[in-house]
């Protein structure tokens, strides 16, 4: 007999029963660290929280696919690598290694997949281009933003 799982919905601050889209394969995606500097306590909190959720889901459902990305290219990384006079690759390898050591120290399980941003640049550019073409995103000062007012289910999203 499976126990129900209740999670807090941050949009209404109420506990709601977790109803999976696919009971045969629960899928969870978590934004991982941007590896520009040594890991800190702010990196540890989501590690621990989502590790507990991952373990709970694995004990409740037969299959759980957990994806946590590693952002290994962005403005902070470029700036930090320039300040340290090392390549972005050298910096991100060093910081990613420290992050993985912390994961191990905190007894966090490895996600099912851990993609790095640099492994998917072409796909990201393609997706961003499509979002802009369809009017769901726009560029401003070399940044791309979602056009959240175009979302159909506005009650499920917060925006200013």
Which residues are covered by each model-predicted region?
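NTP-dependent nucleotidyl-transfer catalytic core
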Residues: 1-160
């Amino acid at each position: 007999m499976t126990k129900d799982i209740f999670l807090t919905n941050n949009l209404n601050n109420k506990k709601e029963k977790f109803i999976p889209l696919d009971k045969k394969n629960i899928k969870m995606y978590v934004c991982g660290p941007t590896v520009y500097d040594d890991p800190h306590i702010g990196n540890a909190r989501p590690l621990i929280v989502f590790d507990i959720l991952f373990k709970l889901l694995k004990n409740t459902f037969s299959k759980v696919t957990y994806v946590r990305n590693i952002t290994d290219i962005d403005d902070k990384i470029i700036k930090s690598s320039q300040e340290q006079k090392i390549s972005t690759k050298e910096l991100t390898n060093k910081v990613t290694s420290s992050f993985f050591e912390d994961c191990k120290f905190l007894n966090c399980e490895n996600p099912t997949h851990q993609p790095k941003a640099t492994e998917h640049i072409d796909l990201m550019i393609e997706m961003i281009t499509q979002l802009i073409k369809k009017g769901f995103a726009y560029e401003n000062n070399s940044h791309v933003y979602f056009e959240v007012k175009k979302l159909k289910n506005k009650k499920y999203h917060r925006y200013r």
